[in-house]
C-alpha cells in the first residue's frame, strides 16, 4: 500500500510539472539593433549637480555673499527679467546685486525651492541647446523702507560648456517690489 501511495505521488508530481508553463530559461537572443543606443529625445534630465549650483547661488544671495553667488557665472553672462530689463556681463550682474543687497534689501530668504535640471538636445523654439536649470521658489524680502515683499518667482539658468551660468531668466511680479521699495 505504501508503494502504491508513493507511486501515485510521483505520478501526480510528474503530471503537475509537465503541465506547468515553461519558464524562460534562456535570455532572448540579442540583435545588433538591441545593442545600439537609441538617439536621445529632445529633452532629458540633466545631472543633479546643476541643482547644487543653483541652490548655492540662491543661498549666497540670501546671505549677502555676492562673490559666492557670482562664483559660478561666466564672464559673458546675461541676466534678464520678464519685464524686458537685462544686465550684460558678470561685472554688471555683480554690481547690480551688490547694490541691491547693501542699499535696498535688509533681508532676503528663499523657501519651498523646486529645481529641475534638464538637457535640451533639440531646441524647439528659440531656446539654446545645452543644460538648463529650472527653479521655482518663494521669495521673502524685507527692504530698508521697512516694507516686506513675498512672492513666488521662477528662474531659468543656462550653463555653458564649462558649467558656468551664462544666462539667467527671472520671472517675477514687479508690482510688489515697486510697492515695497517706495518711500
State what each model feature region is.
Residues 78-88, 103, 123:
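A short gly/proline-enriched turn/hairpin at secondary-structure junctions
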Residues 15-18:
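C-terminal motif of bacterial Sec signal peptides marking the signal peptidase cleavage site
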Residues 97-145:
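Surface-exposed, charged secondary-structure patches
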Amino acid at each position: 500500500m505504501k508503494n502504491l501511495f508513493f507511486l501515485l505521488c510521483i505520478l501526480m508530481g510528474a503530471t503537475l510539472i509537465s503541465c506547468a508553463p515553461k519558464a524562460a530559461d534562456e535570455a532572448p537572443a540579442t540583435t545588433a539593433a538591441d545593442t545600439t543606443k537609441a538617439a536621445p529625445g529632445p529633452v532629458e534630465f540633466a545631472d543633479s549637480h546643476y541643482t547644487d549650483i543653483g541652490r548655492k547661488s540662491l543661498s549666497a544671495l540670501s546671505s549677502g555673499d555676492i562673490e559666492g553667488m557670482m562664483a559660478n557665472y561666466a564672464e559673458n553672462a546675461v541676466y534678464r527679467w520678464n519685464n524686458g530689463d537685462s544686465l550684460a556681463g558678470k561685472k554688471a550682474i555683480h554690481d547690480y546685486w551688490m547694490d541691491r543687497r547693501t542699499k535696498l534689501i535688509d533681508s532676503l530668504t528663499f523657501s519651498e525651492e523646486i529645481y529641475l535640471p534638464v538637457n535640451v538636445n533639440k531646441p524647439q523654439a528659440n531656446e539654446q541647446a545645452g543644460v538648463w536649470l529650472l527653479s521655482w521658489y518663494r521669495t521673502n524680502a524685507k527692504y530698508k523702507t521697512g516694507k516686506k515683499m513675498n512672492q513666488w518667482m521662477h528662474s531659468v539658468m543656462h550653463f555653458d560648456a564649462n558649467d558656468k551660468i551664462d544666462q539667467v531668466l527671472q520671472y517675477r511680479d514687479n508690482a510688489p517690489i515697486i510697492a515695497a521699495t517706495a518711500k
